[in-house]
Every structure is written in C-alpha cells, then in structure tokens.
Amino acid sequence: MQFRYVVTGLAVVMSLAGCQRTSYDYNNNGSNNPGYTPPLQAQPVPSVQSGALPPPDGASGSQFPSAPASAAPGGVNVASAAPPATALDVTKESMVGNWRVSNGGANCDMFLTLTNLGSGSRGGTRGCSGELTAMGSWEVSGKMVLFKNRSGDTIGRVYKSADARFDGTTNSGQPLSLSR
C-alpha cells in the first residue's frame, strides 16, 4: 500500500472521530454535574410610559447650532474663486484613478472614474471627513476640477499646480491638495 493512501485514510478516520458527539449530557438536571447551571426563568416586564421629554436646562429653541456661512472670511466664496494664472491645463483623462487627499491636515483617498453621473463623472472618497464625505461626482471646468456632492452642488475645487499635484479649497475654505 502506498504511503499517501495510509495518510489519507488516517486523515478521514481522525476527521470522523472529531465529528463524534462528546460525552456531555445536555439533559443533565445538575445532580450529577457540579458545573451545571440551570437556565434562567423569564421575568415580567414592567409597563412602558410615553410622553414628551422636557427641554434640557439652558436650551434655546433649537438643539443644533446654526450652520456656518457658505462664504469664507472676507465675503468671498472660496469655491467660486478663479484659478491662479500659474494653473496648468488639465484633462479629464489625466484625473482618472486613485488620489491621496490632504484636507485641512487630515489625509484620505479619492477615486475618480469616467462613468457618467449627472453632468459630471462618478467619484468618491474613503476615510475623508467634512464636506468630502458627500462627494459623488466631479468634472473639469477650464483649468479647474470641481467636486460635487450627490445633489450636484459644488463642494470644492482644485487646480493643477504640478505634474501630479492639485491644490485648491473646499466650500468651507479648508485647504485641499491631491497627489499621486
């Protein structure tokens, strides 16, 4: 007999032996087994009261703070600002792929595709915070790349500052950089 048949037979026997029931008695009443714990009995549930909660102490009419203004300090909407004169030309095809994003000191990933979505192309982020979490599409407009949320509103824009680098801002004025 060949050795491989012996090994195969032993493996089958060992596997079947492992499938055998243990000697533990699941119907044990505890008299023979000192480690047996009886099951817990169901307890009645008290009735539930319903009603409006009182407002917290010192609360105003709204529990949420007011939304920040859409314009940056100085009254200029940063996302609608024109690119600098030193901005390089950009094509849609050169943007496709994975980008490393630096947004206000935090890093995350951005993925850009050529799949049509509304007036732009599909895109998304992973690990980002703030406005970039809502990114759903992007498009090239002149020398700028616009990032849009799922509603189609521009949430940020960048311009090409070097061969594999883009710089710009989000609508809230946070600095935004893309690099490969």
Swiss-Prot record:
Signal peptide residue numbers: 1-18
Low complexity bias spans: 58-78
Q: InterPro entries, per this entry?
A: Inh/Omp19, OM_lipoprot_Omp19_bac, Protease_inh_b-brl_dom
Lipid linkage positions (N-palmitoyl cysteine): 19
Q: Write out the GO cellular component annotations.
A: cell outer membrane
Major location, coarse class?
membrane
Q: Which domain of life is it from?
A: Bacteria
Q: Which stretches does the entry tag as region Disordered? A: 28-78
Keywords of the record, alphabetical order, are: Cell outer membrane, Lipoprotein, Membrane, Palmitate, Signal
| GO MF annotations in UniProt | endopeptidase inhibitor activity
Instruction: Identify one Pfam family in the record.
Output: Inh
Subcellular localization(s) per the UniProt record: Cell outer membrane
Lipid modification (S-diacylglycerol cysteine) maps to 19
Q: How does it sit in the membrane?
A: Lipid-anchor
- Recorded family membership: Belongs to the rhizobiaceae omp19 lipoprotein family.
Descriptive protein name? Outer membrane lipoprotein omp19 homolog
Q: Which organism is it from?
A: Agrobacterium fabrum (strain C58 / ATCC 33970)
**Protein encoded by which gene:** omp19
